[in-house]
Amino acid sequence: MDLIFPLVGSLLLVICVMVGVAFLTLL
């Protein structure tokens, strides 16, 4: 149960970075 939260946090961080990079490249 303790391993789920860091995994979700890192996954959300990767998604946010990918969305940010895609947004900047589209601009």
Curated annotation (Swiss-Prot):
Transmembrane regions listed in the UniProt entry: 3-23
Cellular component terms per the entry's GO annotation: mitochondrial inner membrane
Catalyzed reactions per annotation: a ubiquinone + NADH + 5 H(+)(in) = a ubiquinol + NAD(+) + 4 H(+)(out)
Keyword Cell membrane set for record: no
Presence of the UniProt keyword Membrane in the record: yes
Membrane topology, from the record: Multi-pass membrane protein
EC id: 7.1.1.2
Cellular compartments annotated: Mitochondrion inner membrane
GO molecular function: NADH dehydrogenase (ubiquinone) activity
Entry keywords, A to Z: Electron transport, Membrane, Mitochondrion, Mitochondrion inner membrane, NAD, Respiratory chain, Translocase, Transmembrane, Transmembrane helix, Transport, Ubiquinone
Family, per entry: Belongs to the complex I subunit 1 family.
Function summary: Core subunit of the mitochondrial membrane respiratory chain NADH dehydrogenase (Complex I) that is believed to belong to the minimal assembly required for catalysis. Complex I functions in the transfer of electrons from NADH to the respiratory chain. The immediate electron acceptor for the enzyme is believed to be ubiquinone.
Protein name from the UniProt record: NADH-ubiquinone oxidoreductase chain 1
Species for this entry: Simulium vittatum
